[in-house]
């Protein structure tokens, strides 16, 4: 959960946390508003798992490109967003809402354009945000109705190392 444009924006992990313990969400909201301090975890084993996960994801991305698929990577480094308010050459404050909206727009543009693969797809409606490692284009069989994008749709492909979530 994060505060964007003055409102809380939730992600799937927030929903999972709430289902596990409703009090956890209340603590997260309190930390977001500065009422309590959020605990910081420093666990080298989690860092190692994250590193291996990113390496695995990178290999999968390389495999998709090697197959000749058109891959559109959604940028999340803020380069697509130039927030207003820079003065005297100082950088403007990071605008998470603008970055999420830009990434979600890039995702929809890639899907409408018929990309074979959308890497790091982003979804954002102002209240919820989500990310998919990969969206894979699936062409429709003859006679199947078109989706909002055309005679194809997209399926989510996740590259988690775990077998179960």
Q: Each predicted region: which residue ranges?
A:
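Metal-dependent nuclease catalytic cores that hydrolyze phosphodiester bonds in DNA/RNA
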Residues: 1-151
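A conserved hydrophobic secondary-structure block that centers on an alpha-helix together
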Residues: 149-165
């Amino acid at each position: 959960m994060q505060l964007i444009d003055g409102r809380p924006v939730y992600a799937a992990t927030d929903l999972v946390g709430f289902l596990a313990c409703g009090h956890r969400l209340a603590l997260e909201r309190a930390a977001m508003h500065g009422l309590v301090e959020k605990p910081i975890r420093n666990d080298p084993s989690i860092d190692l798992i994250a590193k291996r996960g990113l390496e695995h994801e990178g290999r999968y991305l390389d495999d998709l490109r090697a197959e000749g698929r058109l891959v559109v990577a959604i940028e999340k480094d803020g380069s697509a967003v130039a927030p207003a308010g820079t003065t005297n050459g100082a950088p403007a404050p990071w605008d998470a809402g603008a970055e999420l909206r830009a990434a979600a727009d890039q995702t929809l543009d890639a899907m409408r354009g018929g990309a074979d693969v959308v890497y790091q797809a982003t979804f954002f409606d102002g209240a919820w945000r989500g990310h998919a490692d990969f969206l894979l284009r699936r062409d429709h069989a003859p006679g199947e109705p078109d989706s909002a994008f055309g005679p194809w749709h997209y399926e989510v492909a996740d590259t988690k190392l775990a077998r179960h979530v």
